[in-house]
Structures are given as C-alpha cells and as structure tokens.
Amino acid sequence: MIITVLHSHVSFYFIILSFLFFHALHLVGSDGATITIVNRCSFTVWPGILSNSGSGDIGTTGFELVPGGSRSFQAPASWSGRFWARTGCNFNSDTGQGTCLTGDCGSNQVECNGAGAKPPATLAEFTIGSGPADPARKQDFYDVSLVDGYNVPMLVEASGGSEGTCLTTGCVTDLNQKCPTELRFGSGSACKSACEAFGSPEYCCSGAYASPTECKPSMYSEIFKSACPRSYSYAFDDATSTFTCTDADYTITFCPSLPR
C-alpha cells in the first residue's frame, strides 16, 4: 500500500513537471517567427534571403523552389532581413555556378552568401520583434516593397498574431504587363523603378530630396501604387505600406493569384 501511494505521488509530480516543461518550450518557441515561402508560379524560382547586419542566420541564403513547392524557416527574435524571387536562373550542374535573369544577387551561386538582389526585384521585408526579452519592441514589422522595382507578384500573410494590423500585404498585379516602356527591363521580365531607370535624386529620394517633405510620389511610383496600394512605391511611402503584428507566423507567396 505504501508503495502504491508513493508511486501515485511520483506519477502526479511527473505529470506536473512535464506540463511545466512543455509550457516552457512553448514560451521559448514563441520567440521569433516561422516564415514559409510558397511558389505558386508556373515556373521555378530561386528565392534569395538577406539577413541584415547583426541578425542571425536562418539556415540558407538561397535555394531552388519548384512550382507548388514550399519551404519554412525559423527567424529568431530581433531578426531582420528580406526575401525575393530570382527568376530565369541557370546554374551549372557540375560547378554550381550560374546567374539569374532577374533578382540576381551576384554570388554566381544558388546561395547568395550575404548579397542582396540586383534591381529590379519585388522584396518582402521583415523586422521580427524581440519577444519577451524586450516588451517595448515585441511587435513585428513587415512590408512588400517595389522601391527596387518589380519582377514577380508577391503576397505576405500573417497568421496567429495579435496586437497590430496583421493585414495581408503585397502586389498580386502583374506589373510587367503595365510597365511603361522606359521602365521595362530586358524583354519585359521585370519592371524597373524610376530611380533605377533614371538615377535622378528626385526619384531616388537622395541628396536634396532625402526627406519625406522633399521626396514626393512621382508619376511612375503612382503607377505602382495604383496597382498595388499596400506595397511601398517609393522610399517614404511608409503610412500605407508598413504593417505590424505580434507573435505571428508569416507566409510569402510568389504568384499568389494562380489556382491553389
């Protein structure tokens, strides 16, 4: 009988400790965010990933993603960086070397190794909150940017979050079909920003135009904004283009308008 009672107490305490352990794991897991990349395009893309200075590694800086494919990453608390799609890539099966038609990062490899996208490219940008370590900075910030031009449609969706707008953002319109001739890249595989096309300070928000009061939307950025109202169309397009959420996970979808 004594043995039975002791065994019951041990079982009870084991259950309590197990509960506390898994609860602690849940709290640890809530730091950072899971970011999933989905390719709904009818063609293969090679996503590029650039972590900002001081941010941790999330496992890769570039990879191949076939139509219908997906891949997830755990971005740690306080991570910031960007994602984009490289298209028209050709990598040698023996050497691994090659280049991409749009979004190329100049590494000459599938991995971008700390290099960013060469414009034009549609960008998804994130700053993940610091979590419980710093409650003042717990919110995530995210956006889809056309400041460096456009190459593929993109959507960013937040799931499971709170304490913010947590809205879906992106550009589902095929801007390559609406691209002005003077902004067209190559045979029409991408659309340059006015800054990339002309290099003028008023388009690049640089020099005397490096402030929100001086740099205003141009006729070209308005074309982007009209087609994709929640995306950044020029450098100071913050008010309608940056979104926040807390404790969320995110899905980046390339070519989201195609059937699932």
From Swiss-Prot:
Signal sequence extent: 1-32
Q: What is the lineage of its organism?
A: Eukaryota, Viridiplantae, Streptophyta, Embryophyta, Tracheophyta
The yes or no answer to whether the keyword Disulfide bond is present is yes
Mutant phenotype after disruption: Normal induced systemic resistance (ISR) mediated by P.fluorescens WCS417r toward the pathogenic bacteria P.syringae pv. tomato DC3000.
Q: Name one GO biological process term.
A: defense response
Question: So what does this one do?
Answer: Involved in local responses of roots to colonization by non-pathogenic plant growth-promoting rhizobacteria (PGPR) fluorescent Pseudomonas spp., but seems to not being required for the establishment of subsequent induced systemic resistance (ISR).
Q: Which family does the record assign?
A: Belongs to the thaumatin family.
**Disulfide pairs?**
C41-C255, C89-C100, C105-C112, C166-C245, C171-C228, C179-C191, C195-C204, C205-C215
SUPFAM superfamilies this protein is in?
Osmotin, thaumatin-like protein
Keyword Signal listed? The answer is: yes
Keywords, comma-separated and alphabetical: Disulfide bond, Pathogenesis-related protein, Plant defense, Signal
Query: Pfam families given for it?
Result: Thaumatin
Q: What is this protein called?
A: Thaumatin-like protein 1
Q: Its domain of life?
A: Eukaryota
Q: In which tissues is it expressed?
A: Expressed only in roots.
**InterPro entries recorded:** Osmotin/thaumatin-like_sf, Thaumatin
